[in-house]
């Protein structure tokens, strides 16, 4: 019998949960749109205050006064691991599924607000700035959040079905939890690489760009 590769397992997983992946992706992009809408709903004074602090930050960045890469990496991996770990735990809790929806939506809002504000205030320069400050880490981080969110929801639904059929969670196969834990490890590895990008790549790109803008 041919051994099933990890690629085949992943493709089968996506096929089996395609509707969930679509739902989670739509929820995330709704958050992105909502984040951009929040930018447009801000008053002029609010935008000016926020842009002032942002300009101060970019000014320090262009002067090479940003925090050390090691500190940024530590803060980034801690934040991402905490957020993803909470999603994972909520998937086991069954009743935490609505909170997973909210967390995915909020992640979209953060991305949408960040990009929307930079573009709104700085035009084309803001677009390129968001490109170098947001894109590198989020190339891996956004898929990690979407996969973790989908797996957490799918696992929670599986436990709910088990609860209604068996009237107990004690009969749930231990393999479920093993696979679910493996998913978390893979996602945390993606988050680790993403944090490396955020700490060591994005600041370099931002420093080069801000030195031309500020």
UniProtKB/Swiss-Prot annotation:
Q: Where are the disulfide bridges?
A: none
Record keyword Cell membrane present: yes
Q: Quick one: effect of changing residue 107 to R?
A: Partially restores the sporulation efficiency of SpoIIP G-108 mutant
User: On the Cytoplasmic side, which residues?
Assistant: 1-18, 107-108, 161-180
Q: Which residues form a coiled coil?
A: none
Extracellular topological domain: 40-85, 130-139, 202-214
Q: Keywords in alphabetical order, please.
A: Cell membrane, Membrane, Sporulation, Transmembrane, Transmembrane helix
Main subcellular location: membrane
One annotated GO biological process = positive regulation of cell septum assembly
Q: Which GO terms describe its cellular component?
A: cell septum; plasma membrane
Topology within the bilayer? Multi-pass membrane protein
- What results from changing residue 75 to R? Partially restores the sporulation efficiency of SpoIIP G-108 mutant
Record's subcellular location: Cell membrane
- Transmembrane segment boundaries: 19-39, 86-106, 109-129, 140-160, 181-201
Q: Which NCBIfam families match?
A: spo_II_M (TIGR02831)
Q: Could you give the subunit structure recorded for this chain?
A: Component of the MPD complex composed of SpoIIM, SpoIIP and SpoIID.
Entry protein name:
Stage II sporulation protein M
- Which organism encodes this protein? Bacillus subtilis (strain 168)
Primary gene name: spoIIM
């Amino acid at each position: 019998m041919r051994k099933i590769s990890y690629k085949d397992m992943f493709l089968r997983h996506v096929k089996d949960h395609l509707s969930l992946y679509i739902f989670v992706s739509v929820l995330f992009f709704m958050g992105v749109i909502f984040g951009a809408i929040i930018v447009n709903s801000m008053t002029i004074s609010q935008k000016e205050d926020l842009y002032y602090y942002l300009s101060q930050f970019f000014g320090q960045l262009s002067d090479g006064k940003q925090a050390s890469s090691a500190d940024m990496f530590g803060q980034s991996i801690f934040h991402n691991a905490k957020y993803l770990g909470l999603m994972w735990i909520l998937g086991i809790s069954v009743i935490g599924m609505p909170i997973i929806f909210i967390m995915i939506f909020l992640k979209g809002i953060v991305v949408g607000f960040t990009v929307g504000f930079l573009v709104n205030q700085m035009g084309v320069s803001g677009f390129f700035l968001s490109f170098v400050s947001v894109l590198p880490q989020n190339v891996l981080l956004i898929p990690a959040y979407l996969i973790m969110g989908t797996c957490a929801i799918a696992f929670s639904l599986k436990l709910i079905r088990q609860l209604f059929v068996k009237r107990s969670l004690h009969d749930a196969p231990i393999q479920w939890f093993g696979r679910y834990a493996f998913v978390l490890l893979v996602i945390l590895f993606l988050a680790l690489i993403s944090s490396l990008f955020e700490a060591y790549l994005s600041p370099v790109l931002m420093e080069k760009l801000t030195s031309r803008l500020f």
